[in-house]
Amino acid sequence: MIQMTLIQIDNYGPWTVTPTPRNEADLQIMQAELYADLQRQFAARQGLVFFTRFDNMLAVTNGMDLEDHRRIQKSIGNRYPITVSMGVGAAETPYDAQRNASRALQSHGGAQSEERKEVLAIDGLVDEGYVQIAHIDINGITETMTDIVPAYDTSFIVNRVQHFLMKKLIKEGALLFFIGGDNFMSPCNGLEPQGLLRIINEIDDEINVALKAGIGKAPTAEKAANLADLALEEIRGGFTYDLVHVMKE
């Protein structure tokens, strides 16, 4: 079982234009600072946050209980001009877990409801479970793209790869998030290494972009992500010729 938390800024759209539209640079700064703040607080509890849409973020939170979430929620409310609500869900796959978390929060009102504030909606918590995360990157992007084509063209290709990965992984109950550079992370409980290898080969055939992936499996998101990083580094370093390499705690 994997546990996912949806973090949603309360009534954010209306707030950004009340009493008049706020400076866009200030909004971008606040969103970036809020994400960094949440990442720091969830990481201190072995969780991992993905910025997703910035006003809606998703976190893998195995090992975190109601009180952990409540403390983070209150901390944000004390220090920011906005508040956040959270929904927590658990399931066998990450997609189902985030769906349960979303439904739990949605049952308490819409994202732009003036009445909904600092809701903590729990659909389910994981007592004993695990987190499986894949760290995926593009082979040789620096030499083949970054150093020879315009920056925006490289960004376009990275976004295209993300689109293809998301379409294929969601069919397996897995999620995918861009984490910078040419890197993606996929919470993928229930996906076998052979299944991810098949997806990587399909993308190579379809859009001529070669990928590789390290998979980590551990009780918490932070540990699983670290193992995924180490597994990917073994591929990069030539310690294995596999395109998908697994490390477990």
Swiss-Prot record:
InterPro entries: GTP_CycHdrlase_3, Nucleotide_cyclase, Rev_trsase/Diguanyl_cyclase. It holds the Pfam family GCH_III. It catalyses: GTP + 3 H2O = 2-amino-5-formylamino-6-(5-phospho-D-ribosylamino)pyrimidin-4(3H)-one + 2 phosphate + 2 H(+). The keyword GTP-binding applies. GO terms for biological process: biosynthetic process. One of its GO terms (molecular function) is GTP binding. The keyword Nucleotide-binding applies. Its EC number is 3.5.4.29. Coiled coil: none annotated. Belongs to the archaeal-type GTP cyclohydrolase family. Catalyzes the formation of 2-amino-5-formylamino-6-ribofuranosylamino-4(3H)-pyrimidinone ribonucleotide monophosphate and inorganic phosphate from GTP. Also has an independent pyrophosphate phosphohydrolase activity. NCBIfam families: PRK02240.1. This is GTP cyclohydrolase III. The gene is gch3.
